[in-house]
């Protein structure tokens, strides 16, 4: 029989199979910004893991727009997906109220108030505190932060880690926090504001990859040098270490592991297992971008 199937080039009709099993063999994935490097790497790894278990994915990019997010979730439901993996814009968990109660769901990079989903997170607050301590340990006291938008879970957690470390060191100054909205342009504008403020800043901590790129563009454009003029810690290495001198100290998230774990948590729910949360550890990689100051 197998030989006959191979000779005929038979391909199983998954739609017909789905009608029998009441499964579409498809997982819906909803991302706020697919152009974001963070999202792209996670989705790629997630797809590989789900494919190994016979599932395809249907990806929606909601462009950080809550209305598009709602429309996209309704679209995924209409396609009868077997589960959803979402990077929610909001942390209130209300977005999941749009879905059937029994639909397996996983939230990435956000801790929501919903008890009906599993979560995959990193130790945002702890790793940001460690990065900030690296700067204070090198004698820095005027440390600027380029943060994401207020109210976004990851941005808030990373800011809190920075604040806690500086409060312990006795040098916290809220005026040194600049919002960069997790985009290259946002990082660029925030860094230019810091450089032009002349407020004694000697070090900068940037809390995502796109803003890190934007901040470095601004530093180069204004003729400043790292670490001679400003010590610098960025977020996520990706290709930075290959193209930038000196090597930038960075907080590196386990992006591929995040994707794998998100897929695993969803597969567990599809198998009838209980929801659970996973917190992964990011790493702080030293570079040559932090100097000692007296």
Predicted regions and their residues:
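Short beta-strand and adjacent tight-turn residues that come in two discontinuous sequence segments
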Residues: 81, 86-87, 145
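Amphipathic helical "hinge" segments at domain boundaries
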Residues: 8-75, 79-83, 160-163
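Short beta->alpha connector loops
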Residues: 63-66, 87-92, 210
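Residue-level recognition of strand-loop junctions within catalytic nucleotide-signaling folds
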Residues: 32-33, 89, 148, 289
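Active-site-adjacent beta->alpha loops and helix N-cap segments on the catalytic face
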Residues: 91-100
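Bacterial carbohydrate/catabolite-sensing allosteric modules
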Residues: 6-7, 45-56, 71, 77, ...
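Redox-cofactor binding/interface segments in oxidoreductases and associated redox assembly factors
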Residues: 29, 86, 206
């Amino acid at each position: 029989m197998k030989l006959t199937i191979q000779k005929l080039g038979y391909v199983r009709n998954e739609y017909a199979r789905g009608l029998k099993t009441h499964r579409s063999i498809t997982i819906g994935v909803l991302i706020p910004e697919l152009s974001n490097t963070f999202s792209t790497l996670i989705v790629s790894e997630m797809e590989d893991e789900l494919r190994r278990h016979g599932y395809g994915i249907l990806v929606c990019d909601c462009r950080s727009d809550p209305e598009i997010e709602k429309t996209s979730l309704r679209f995924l439901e209409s396609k009868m997906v077997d589960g959803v993996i979402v990077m929610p814009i909001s942390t209130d968990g209300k977005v999941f109220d749009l879905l059937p109660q029994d639909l397996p769901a996983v939230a990435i990079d956000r801790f929501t108030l919903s008890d009906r989903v599993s979560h995959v997170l990193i130790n945002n607050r702890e790793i940001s505190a460690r990065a900030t301590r690296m700067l204070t340990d090198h004698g820095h006291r005027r440390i600027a932060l380029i943060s994401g938008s207020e109210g976004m879970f990851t941005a808030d957690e990373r800011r809190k880690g920075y604040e806690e470390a500086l409060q312990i060191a006795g040098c916290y100054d809220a005026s040194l926090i600049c919002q960069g909205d997790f985009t290259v342009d946002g990082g660029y504008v925030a860094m230019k504001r810091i450089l032009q403020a002349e407020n004694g800043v000697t070090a900068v901590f940037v809390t995502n990859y796109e803003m890190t790129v934007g901040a470095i563009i601004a530093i180069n454009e204004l003729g400043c040098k790292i670490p001679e003029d400003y010590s610098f810690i960025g977020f996520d290495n990706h290709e930075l270490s290959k193209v930038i001198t000196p090597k930038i100290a960075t907080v590196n998230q386990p992006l591929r592991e995040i994707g794998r774990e998100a897929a695993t948590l969803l597969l567990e729910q599809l198998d009838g297992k209980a929801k659970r949360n996973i917190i992964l550890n990011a790493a702080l990689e030293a570079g040559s971008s932090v100097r000692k100051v007296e």
